[in-house]
């Protein structure tokens, strides 16, 4: 009788362990970036921009990075595709895992990362070449030269960026001839033409008018079904409109991280409440 009871208890323990492991695996599968104790210094250690930052970025979510100017959010964003490597005198510590691979490892070529993590900047940056060639540039760089294949990639990318109907008859026109909002959508189309897994966006609507901003926001909400999106924004209302999760940065640290609704409706910390209510900036 005692042996039967003990075996039953052991079986329950095993079941609980299996259940816990399955939940853990499920959580890991839903994380595209895992950041552990990340610190960064400029000027060979003279100025610290990030201080022991840890966070998870969820797959197929829009994650907003908010905080006052100079708090480290853009530096953090650039670290996710190692763009800070191009700045002289930058020192880093900590780990960043992208889909399970440590991107801080010298064994991982930066080209692996750049083909999987696209970037859209604050100011639209179309190349001074045709609309078609703007989109085809990335695929060509990756070895695709068949015209029929390129035509399809260009069309699909422009459709995904909600720009195809506006430019399909003018693909030979310069990308720089488009309006500001169209240029930004062209840059988004260019980023997704290489079929990345993640889109990083550094204040992508700050230079746009309200109508163009609304179109880009609508596009972001559609794109998250296919991509994980991380966006830096100074607009509290924009973060609430388009993001699922929010990381609040202050003085190089993540002060609070949570679902966006929780951050804005039920912030846990006074500093978060003060920032959201405009008492600090």
UniProtKB/Swiss-Prot annotation:
Q: Which reaction does it catalyse?
A: phosphate(out) + ATP + H2O = ADP + 2 phosphate(in) + H(+)
| Location relative to the cell | Cell membrane
One biological process term from GO is: phosphate ion transmembrane transport
- Boundaries of every ABC transporter domain copy: 33-276
Record's keyword terms, sorted: ATP-binding, Cell membrane, Membrane, Nucleotide-binding, Phosphate transport, Translocase, Transport
UniProt-annotated binding residues for ATP: 67-74
In short, the EC number is 7.3.2.1
Q: Which InterPro entries match?
A: AAA+_ATPase, ABC_transporter-like_ATP-bd, ABC_transporter-like_CS, P-loop_NTPase, PstB-like
Q: What is its main location?
A: membrane
Q: Which CDD domains match?
A: ABC_PstB_phosphate_transporter (cd03260)
Give GO MF terms, alphabetically.
ATP binding; ATP hydrolysis activity; ATPase-coupled phosphate ion transmembrane transporter activity
Which SUPFAM superfamilies would you find in this protein's record?
P-loop containing nucleoside triphosphate hydrolases
Q: What does this protein do?
A: Part of the ABC transporter complex PstSACB involved in phosphate import. Responsible for energy coupling to the transport system.
Q: Which family does it belong to?
A: Belongs to the ABC transporter superfamily. Phosphate importer (TC 3.A.1.7) family.
Looking up NCBIfam families in the UniProt record yields: 3a0107s01c2
Specify the protein name. Answer: Phosphate import ATP-binding protein PstB
The record lists the organism as: Mycoplasma mobile (strain ATCC 43663 / 163K / NCTC 11711) (Mesomycoplasma mobile)
| Taxonomic lineage of the native organism | Bacteria, Bacillati, Mycoplasmatota, Mycoplasmoidales, Metamycoplasmataceae
